[in-house]
């Protein structure tokens, strides 16, 4: 019978991905080797997506700002009427085609994310071919307060732990952040015609039962993103006051990272245990925890049958 100090267990494996330097005239970062990088947009409407071409659920996504997001179907109907009455002027199309965010929450934003991505592709030429993440059937598991740059002026600013189906139909899991800000209020015909704006948009994701293993490398990559100082200055010069607040760009990314770390520390470990058991079942492991430290390890199948000590217990 194995003794506690000589048991055949090992720490949970983390992905053996290595990071490499990557840079453009807009930003630089450390990206996972072999992964694709897309960067597109203009000014504060800039998006970055870093993803594994073999499995697009494995990704880092960041966008500085998205607007407009309408407040109601009644508002959208009004804008569509203005669009028709003004001979389909492109100025009104921006609003006539906009996505309705019934609830100004981070959860509703990600529930509508596929629709929002399609809309942005259609109205912003510099993002016309940008491949937004596919987040079908987005479901919130947990939510945490964020430390995001726009939190103080936001209606909602959260980090969500959520699940989704990716573009391959595979189940994914990740951490998702945004801040939803009200642009203002202007009523006509009983509808508020103004809109919400989304800032601090960032997601890190992987396959559902692998996210716990990918989290660290994804966070390290996301946290390494640095915007070129000339790009930041030009965008600040072109922007308004709120834009300037959001545009301490590199500080915003640090705040996003801090938000993620805080959220991860606060998470419900029960989700991790369920994910790990599912993952282990296909790999022929069983999961045990150290009763003295609380750390979780992988052991060979049948370990708990062989082991009669008290220190290591099966994770249930």
Q: Where are these predicted regions, by residue range?
A:
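N-terminal low-complexity, Pro/Thr/Ser-rich intrinsically disordered segments
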Residues: 2-20
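Alpha-helix initiation/capping motif
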Residues: 10-13, 52, 105, 205-207, ...
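Sequence-level motif detector for i,i+2 pairs with an aromatic at +2
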Residues: 14-19, 26, 155-157, 197
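Short aromatic-glycine motifs in intrinsically disordered, low-complexity regions
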Residues: 17-30, 208-219
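Proline-anchored loop/turn motifs at beta-strand termini and strand-loop-strand connectors
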Residues: 24-42, 221-228
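Surface-exposed amphipathic alpha-helical segments
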Residues: 35, 200-244
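Conserved polar/disulfide-associated segments of primarily extracytoplasmic proteins
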Residues: 38-208, 234, 255, 262-316
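Signal-transducing coiled-coil/dimerization helices and immediately adjacent hinge/linker segments
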Residues: 242-257
């Amino acid at each position: 019978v194995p003794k506690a100090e000589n048991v055949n267990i090992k720490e949970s494996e983390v992905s053996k991905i290595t990071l490499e330097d990557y840079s453009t005239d807009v930003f630089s970062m450390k990206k996972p080797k072999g992964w694709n990088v897309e960067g597109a947009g203009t000014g504060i409407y800039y998006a970055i997506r870093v993803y594994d071409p073999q499995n697009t659920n494995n990704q880092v996504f960041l966008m500085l700002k998205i607007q407009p997001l309408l407040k109601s179907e009644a508002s959208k109907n009004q804008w569509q009427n203005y669009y028709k009455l003004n001979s389909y002027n492109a100025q009104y199309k921006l609003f006539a085609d906009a996505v309705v965010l019934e609830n100004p929450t981070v959860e509703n934003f990600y529930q509508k994310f596929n629709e929002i991505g399609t809309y942005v592709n259609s109205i912003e030429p510099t993002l016309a071919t940008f491949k937004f993440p596919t987040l079908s059937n987005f479901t919130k598991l947990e939510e945490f307060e964020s430390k995001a740059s726009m939190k103080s002026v936001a209606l909602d600013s959260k980090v969500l732990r959520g699940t989704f189906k990716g573009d391959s139909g595979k189940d994914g899991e990740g951490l998702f952040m945004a801040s939803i800000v009200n642009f203002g209020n202007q009523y006509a015909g009983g509808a508020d015609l103004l809109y919400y704006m989304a800032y601090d948009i960032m997601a890190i994701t992987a396959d559902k039962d692998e996210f716990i293993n990918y989290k660290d490398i994804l966070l390290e990559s996301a946290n390494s993103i640095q915007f070129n100082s000339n790009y930041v200055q030009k965008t600040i010069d072109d922007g308004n006051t709120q834009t300037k607040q959001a545009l301490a760009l590199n500080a915003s990314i640090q705040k996003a990272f801090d938000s993620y770390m805080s959220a991860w520390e606060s998470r419900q470990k029960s989700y991790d245990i369920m994910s790990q058991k599912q993952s282990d079942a296909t790999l022929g492991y069983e999961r045990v925890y150290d009763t003295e430290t609380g750390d979780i390890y992988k052991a060979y199948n049948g370990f708990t049958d062989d082991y009669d000590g008290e220190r290591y217990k099966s994770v249930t």
